[in-house]
Structure formats: structure tokens, C-alpha cells
């Protein structure tokens, strides 16, 4: 189920979640190498959680790098060989923020095709008064 113009409430610090989304989208833009770059954002209902997917059609992440992209100071081959490379702490901060909120983050990617970053946050559910 993809949400369309529907309010979704999660248990989270809004500023921290904005930081997560900003970091992921900034990385997608930073490593975009196509003249017509595309970034898609989807929000899905997955039981007690909301899943956010941020997909790009950028350079992608190689299979040997993918398991480590959320490790502190890890830089992929693409970022090490790029003048745009960062410090390697951005995605580790994303992971920490999401874990502190009871969520998690992961990614799938194919070199030359792009990357999908996924993260989940627990939905807010009102407890009925007795």
C-alpha cells in the first residue's frame, strides 16, 4: 500500500527525520551522473511501521561496498574516486538516528542503475482510554 495524500503519524523527532531524508537525498544528488537524474520517494504501510523508500538512478553502489555503507567512516569505491566524496559519516548518522527511533535502514543497489534506500519508523497508534 502506497500512501497518497494521507496523513501518517510516526513516533519521531521531526527535525532528526528531516536530517535523515536530507542526507539520503543529498547523497543521491551528489553521486548522480546522468543528465536526467530521477529521485523517487515512496511511503508504504507495513503493519506497525511506515516504510520510506528513496530511489535514485545514479551510479549505484557495488556489491562489495553495499554491506558497509552504514559503517562510520566507510567510503565506497565511487566516493573514494570522486572529487565529491564526503567524510564517510553521513550514512552512519542516518543509521544511528533511525535506530534511536526504533527503526532501521538498509539499501539495495546495482552499479550503473541506481540505489534504493529503505527505512522504517513505527507508526503512532493511539491507545484507547478505558
Q: Which residues fall in each region the model found?
A:
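Conserved micro-motifs of the catalytic ATP-binding
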Residues: 9-12
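Short conserved segment of the HATPase_c
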Residues: 61-75
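Short alpha-helical Gxxx[C/S/T] motif in the catalytic ATP-binding
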Residues: 90, 94
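Conserved glycine-rich
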Residues: 102-103
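Short beta-strand/loop element within the Bergerat-fold HATPase_c
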Residues: 38-48
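Acidic ATP/Mg2+-coordinating residue in the GHKL
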Residues: 56
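Short, small-residue-biased leader/transition segments that mark boundaries at the very start
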Residues: 2-3
